[in-house]
Design a protein with these regions (language model features):
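Walker A (P-loop) ATP-phosphate-binding motif of ABC ATPase nucleotide-binding domains
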Residues: 221
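Conserved inter-motif catalytic segment of the P-loop NTP-binding fold
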Residues: 2-98, 108, 244
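Hydrophobic anchor at the beta1->P-loop junction of P-loop NTPases
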Residues: 224
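P-loop NTPase motor core
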Residues: 72-154
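Hydrophobic positions on the alpha1 helix immediately C-terminal to the Walker A/P-loop
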Residues: 235
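Conserved GTP-binding G-domain of TRAFAC-class P-loop NTPases and closely related GTPase folds
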Residues: 133-217
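Conserved lysine of the Walker
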Residues: 232
Length: 244
């Protein structure tokens, strides 16, 4: 788990989190530190897959991102991508605190290359990102990922599932934490590639893994969008199946 803004304290002490996930929390303070840790953990491996089209056999080169030295890493968590992108953005500003026009393109390109790399990692990928309201000018709003630059417009293409966090009050007065899984004008990025989940579900990753198993996905890439305090970090506890 990469904790970019000390949100992991929601899950407990460092020792409690290590016991929960099997590894300690990683907390890089700069974008370059994050890249260094990722490069220490993973490597890119090129493999050739043979595919038959009728009587024709085609060689396809595939790039796979795998853990180094046979280390077992079942899941990678980034909390949050909003803060990670800001850490990189801070390295691009000049002495006046502003970015040049070409730097916005550099920001987009770097974040896209990072997303392409980490979404090739096998297993489960969970990325949390803060949300931001956009006024559409007709009295309606939509919720976007809080990422400066244009990455927020198409970030969902990298993921199998994109959920928005919501809270509702139950009849007994308790707060219930749910995920919005279906696309609407307001929840513009929401999606479920299995098309098996209801429009609203409790914030429980085991529900996602059930439909992933049914569809026989080989990996699971999940983006969670929501405001602070809406369950993004707390729900990470459900990555562990306590019944297994």
């Amino acid at each position: 788990m990469f904790d970019l803004e000390r949100g992991s304290q929601t899950l407990g002490s460092p020792n409690a989190i290590k016991e929960l996930f099997g590894y300690p929390v990683l907390a890089p303070t700069t974008f370059s530190q994050f890249k260094k840790i990722i490069s220490d953990l993973y490597t890119v491996q090129k493999t050739v897959h043979k595919t038959k089209i009728g009587n024709i056999e085609i060689d396809q080169e595939v790039l796979e991102t795998i853990p180094k030295n046979g280390t077992q890493i079942d899941a990678l968590i980034l909390d949050t991508f909003s803060e990670l992108s800001k850490k990189y953005q801070r390295s691009l500003v000049d002495k006046t605190g502003k970015m040049k026009i070409q730097d916005w393109g550099k920001l987009k390109n770097t974040l896209d290359m990072l997303l392409e790399f980490i979404t090739r990692i096998p297993g489960v990928l969970v990325i949390n990102v803060h949300s931001k309201l956009r006024d559409l000018g007709d009295g309606t709003t939509k919720i976007l990922p809080y990422i400066d630059g244009s990455t927020k417009e198409d970030i969902s293409k990298w993921f199998d599932f994109v959920f928005y966090t919501r809270t509702i009050e139950a009849p007994n007065g308790e707060t219930q934490y749910i995920w919005q899984t279906k696309h609407t004008e307001k929840y513009d990025h929401a999606k479920d590639r299995t098309n098996l989940l209801p429009a609203e579900i409790p914030q429980d990753f085991q529900l996602v893994f059930d439909v992933v198993k049914e569809k026989e996905f080989t990996s699971t890439k999940i983006l969670i969008i929501g405001s602070p305090g809406s369950g993004k970090t707390w729900s990470l506890k459900t990555l562990i199946n306590k019944e297994s």
